[in-house]
């Protein structure tokens, strides 16, 4: 069987203009940057399984959710993926991303910082805090990942 992939603990790295940090267990902790739309069509295949991402804490109803959305050129690999409730990923979070994309398309400067909140040693966040700054105006939104 394939060795389970994991990220380094307490690490900081950049991909596609975004900065990511991991916590003391190697879980995705923050993802942030100034949003930009990717310059190519289509989506890259996600190579990591939901089990690679959730380390056994994922639910059967979870999607492999991007922290920074694919449309914003968010990485399509382990460092940008979390077990995300499919209802949240395909509805509330997608609507949030749609609004941010409209702001980017309108030429506004949109900064997004996401912080994942994990219960105990779980690799599945139970909440995601999103801090958006659009042309200097900051808003905070919390998404529950039930």
Residue ranges and their predicted role:
Residues 1-9:
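Single conserved hydrophobic/aromatic residue that forms the stacking wall/gate
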Residues 12-146:
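Domain-level detector of nuclease and nuclease-like folds
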């Amino acid at each position: 069987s394939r060795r389970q992939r994991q990220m380094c603990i307490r690490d900081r790295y950049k991909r596609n203009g975004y900065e990511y940090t991991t916590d003391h267990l190697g879980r995705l902790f923050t993802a942030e940057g100034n949003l930009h739309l990717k310059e190519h069509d289509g989506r890259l295949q996600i190579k990591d399984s939901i089990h690679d991402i959730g380390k056994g804490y994922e639910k059967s109803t979870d999607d492999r959710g991007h922290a920074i959305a694919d449309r914003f050129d968010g990485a399509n690999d382990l460092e940008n993926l979390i077990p995300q409730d499919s209802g949240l990923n395909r509805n509330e979070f997608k609507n949030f991303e749609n609004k941010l994309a409209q702001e980017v398309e309108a030429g506004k400067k949109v900064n997004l910082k996401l912080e994942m909140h994990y219960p105990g040693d779980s690799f599945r966040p139970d909440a995601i805090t999103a801090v958006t700054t659009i042309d200097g105006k900051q808003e905070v939104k919390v998404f529950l990942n039930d």
